[in-house]
Amino acid sequence: ENKLICCSSLILVGLTFKNQNKHYRSSLSILQKFIKNNFDNSGFPKSRNPEELMICLKYLILIKEWIKESQNQIPDYLEEIIFNCGKSYSFLSKNLNELPLFNGSSEIKNEEFEKYLNYLNYNFNDNSKEKNGYVIFKDKKIVFIMDIGNSPDFKYSKKYQSGCLSFEITSNKEKLICNLGFDINKNNKIKLLSRSTAAHSTLYLNNHSSCIFRTSYPFKIHHENRLREGLKVVKKKIVIEKDFENIIASHNGYQNRYGYIHERSIKFIKKEKIFLGIDNLIKNKKASN
């Protein structure tokens, strides 16, 4: 998101000074390239970080408003990414007071950002059950969110946390079960601990996480604690019925080290407002015992 903030500054300079039209056009090209390289087709950052989604949406809207005020034409790609980012934000934040703590997100209240959107007359809506590697079950009081997505590519993993199949449950906008979250201001040891599977509401084996992070590079400022070995979700099945909703998903994060696939099934019984869950370790030929 820092690149987007810098890009927005360049665009503002190009719009402010009349003799900087060439600079403005160049800045728009940088913005277009940034969008292409850092977002998936649904408008979600490739890092899969909810906090990054919110920050990027804020600055993308700000850029659009600047261009509109300057009476320049708003690029179609900017309109499209704002629409898609907005829907993804709505998907993750609806009926919640704060962002869910997955994949680098910290404890941020939604209230101020919602005021920002309302002030500028932006209204996004998305009622999907699955999007961006997350699945959501909800009713008027309960919100259940689970991470069922692959780990990101190395270059997008700066804040990634190895919490695949972890979940959060919120009731009346109060969290009952949550992950640890990520704090960029903490020291490197604490940040690394917060990225472990043990810091999430999911299963870990023998004090090992489902992903492995590198902790030393010749140039740490650029590559600190990025992924060395990620994981893939090898199965997911979502069932939506009148009386219940169910997710079954599994990942291969323990396959190379232990020879097991981790499968998790969670069912939300709507009338009773209860959750039933089970974890399975599925043995393959590589498992020693």
Show which residues each predicted segment covers.
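Carbohydrate-active enzyme catalytic cores, enriched for enzymes
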Residues: 44-178, 182
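Non-catalytic C-terminal accessory modules of carbohydrate-active enzymes
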Residues: 124-289
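Catalytic-loop motifs flanking and including active-site residues across diverse enzymes
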Residues: 6, 56-59, 199
